[in-house]
Amino acid sequence: MEELDYQKIGRKIRAARLEKGWSQDRLSEKCNISLSFMGHIERGTRIMSMDTFVALCNELEISADYLLWDIIRPSDPILLNILNGVKTKDAATY
């Protein structure tokens, strides 16, 4: 079984948070965790509990599949916006 890349998960959480226009402080309050811990999660330097993981997925409207295995579902509007932004930027560089 593949080992989880917590830094990659943290980057995805940060991207989804920024897509919503939220600060770390706002997301940490919504998930009932400290601002410091939120920063550690986004940097991948601390492992979150399952409760925190679920809260982040719910608040950010992203699936656990995406965070863990890069599977994007059509019901993840934030992820689709992020992906569309990446495609647009990639096309503009060529």
Question: Model features per residue range: what roles?
Answer:
Residues 32-47, 69:
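Recognition helix of helix-turn-helix/homeodomain-like DNA-binding domains
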Residues 11-30, 55, 87-92:
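Short basic helix-loop element that most often maps to the first helix and adjoining turn
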Residues 1-8:
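A detector for short, charged/polar N-terminal pre-domain segments
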Residues 7, 18-19, 47:
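Short amphipathic helical patch at the helix-1/turn junction of helix-turn-helix
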Residues 73-94:
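Interfacial/linker helices and their anchor residues that mediate assembly or domain coupling
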Residues 51-66:
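DNA major-groove recognition helix of helix-turn-helix/homeodomain DNA-binding modules
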